[in-house]
Amino acid sequence: MTTPHSQAQPGLPIDPHPDEYKVAALVFYSCIFIIGLFVNVTALWVFSCTTKKRTTVTVYMMNVALLDLVFIMSLPFRMLYYAKGEWPFGEYFCRILGALTVFYPSIALWLLAFISADRYMAIVQPKYAKELKNTCKAVMACVGVWIMTLTTTIPLLLLYEDPDTASSTPPTCLKISDIIYLKAINALNFTRLIFFFLIPLFIMIGCYLVIIHSLLHGKTSKLKPKVKEKSIRIIITLMVQVLVCFMPFHICFAFLMLGGDENSYNPWGAFTTFLMNLSTCLDVILYYIVSKQFQARVISVMLYRNYLRSVRRKSFRSGSLRSLSNINSEML
């Protein structure tokens, strides 16, 4: 299916996105924006303002929520692009949002690796439990990852082989749709795959294997059952999030780089990008497990909504009864 904007014009780039993709992207990003904004604003407020005793996990969660919000705030521009069928915000802003597509999972995976290492310390090395309260080291680790990721993302703003040219009619921003355009700089991309996917992935796998071995062989008998249960829930949540959201994205990324030179719409690239973006909402499970304050906030919001519904029902019923009594009085 083609649109007026996707019809070929001599000498001009073609917008390769089907109408079905644009509709799906609009619906998907609208849901992600609404849910993700509420969840992560609440989480950032809870972890930064209401948590009295901060630990290393609290620091990591604050960074996860902040990273999610940075990414979520770019979604309205994507939605407007798909709705209008053209890019009205200029070439450089398009490059920034395209770079953000790779910037987000790079930091997210390292933060998940930090949380995994934290749970390793809590379960396997409880004698170093004091280190879990050393928030200064956690802050330094997070700052280091942000700086390292920014440094390796800046070259994406300087692409010399750009699918979106200034003469495109209508203006396009193919870079935010999927990751196929990144094949122009494969040397940097393979380096990014190693440092921002494989290394944090191996850290997580190593931590999980040692934790499982310790649990199976009874080497964690000194730990409280609640600590074990909480750590196991965190580990399961992290594993599911990595397997569902980040693994397909990076596998597709690698195959696209090893593929041919054709720079066209790739449904798998777009689909795995959707899955990666879904992580901004799935973090709510992690927040809920880690923080009792976040649990209380979510429960209070749900109770307040139930209260409003009950008030509306009562007002509706009372209004109906009043109208019936008025009708009866008029008939009499």
Curated annotation (Swiss-Prot):
Subcellular localization: Cell membrane; Cytoplasmic vesicle membrane
Q: Which UniProt keywords apply?
A: Cell membrane, Cytoplasmic vesicle, Disulfide bond, G-protein coupled receptor, Glycoprotein, Membrane, Phosphoprotein, Receptor, Transducer, Transmembrane, Transmembrane helix
* Pfam families given in the database record: 7tm_1
Positions of glycan attachment:
189
Show the InterPro entries listed in the entry. Answer: GPCR_Rhodpsn, GPCR_Rhodpsn_7TM
Listed transmembrane segments: 27-47, 57-77, 96-116, 139-159, 193-213, 234-254, 270-290
Q: What is this protein called?
A: N-arachidonyl glycine receptor
From which organism does this entry originate? Bos taurus
